[in-house]
């Protein structure tokens, strides 16, 4: 797949969980092959739902989510399915291939190295591993598929410092597309070069280019500008309302002037930029 090809496209996508919980409203964006992007937003705002839309596990109410017709997608799962806990290591990884892989042991060893996990016996059962080891095996199971789009949700949660370093090195050299959700700013800054920012209030996605820290600073500057504009509008609105009250009390033709003042105040209210709750959390990323 050529480097400049669009591998993922959202076209006027709207999705909601019930009438009162919209996630996306007419969202459009495109991701090119080889992009490494952070998906940013407030906790619980629908980032995981976005991954499910890409995987085809959820269907939008309107619009279209499309992956390049030859493209493959894999995600680092959070838990091993109950019916797979009795699988051996070899069986667990073999299920991700449609044909027998004669070099499967080497492929397994390579992806386990990427998550800093020593190669176990191939006949060891998945339920014999600790929770942290299972998390690494799940992450490795996404890597072994060598997908065109790799989706990672908090991949560093069960990794120590050395494990994060191994994974970072792997992702830097990975030539395909990576979308990642993570609160580990240093990890994100090491290999991503853009952000898809999910706005919980407008239910849209904003695209930013640059390393993680630069993008966070850009968003913070935008927020500060919006806050400053809101302060100015609040002052103007208050003045217009005070003037409207004065004119209304004088009666006669001045009541019409008072009404115009109130209408102007309402219009200014609509122009205010809503302070996003998730924006307040940006310094924590």
Predicted stretch roles:
Residues 2-4, 8, 21, 218-285:
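Flexible nucleotide-interacting loop at or near the entrance of a catalytic core
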Residues 1-226:
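ABC ATP-binding cassette signature C-motif
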């Amino acid at each position: 797949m050529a480097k400049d090809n669009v591998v993922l496209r959202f076209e006027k996508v709207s999705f909601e969980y019930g009438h009162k919980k919209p996630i996306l409203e007419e969202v459009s964006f495109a991701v090119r092959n080889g992009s490494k992007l952070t998906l940013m937003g407030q906790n619980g705002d629908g980032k995981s739902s976005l991954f499910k839309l890409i995987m085809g596990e959820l269907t939008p109410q309107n619009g279209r989510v499309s992956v390049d017709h030859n493209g493959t997608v894999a995600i680092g799962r959070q838990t091993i399915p109950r019916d797979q806990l009795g699988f051996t290591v070899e069986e667990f990884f073999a299920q991700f291939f449609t044909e027998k892989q004669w070099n499967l042991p080497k492929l397994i060893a390579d992806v386990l190295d990427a998550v800093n996990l020593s190669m176990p016996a191939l006949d060891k059962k998945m339920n014999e591993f600790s929770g942290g080891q299972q998390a690494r095996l799940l992450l490795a199971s996404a890597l072994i598929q060598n997908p065109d789009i790799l989706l990672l949700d908090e991949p560093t949660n069960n990794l120590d410092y050395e494990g994060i370093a191994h994974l970072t090195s792997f992702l830097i050299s990975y030539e395909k597309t990576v979308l990642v959700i993570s609160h580990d700013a240093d990890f994100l800054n090491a290999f991503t070069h853009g952000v898809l920012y999910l706005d919980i209030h407008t239910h849209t996605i904003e695209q930013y280019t640059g390393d993680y820290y630069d993008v966070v600073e850009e968003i913070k500057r935008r927020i500060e500008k919006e806050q400053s504009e809101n302060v100015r509008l609040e002052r103007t609105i208050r003045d217009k309302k005070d003037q409207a009250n004065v004119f209304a009390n004088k009666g006669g033709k001045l009541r019409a002037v008072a009404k115009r003042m109130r209408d102007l105040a309402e219009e200014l209210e609509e122009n205010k930029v809503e302070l996003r709750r998730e924006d307040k959390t940006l310094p924590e990323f």
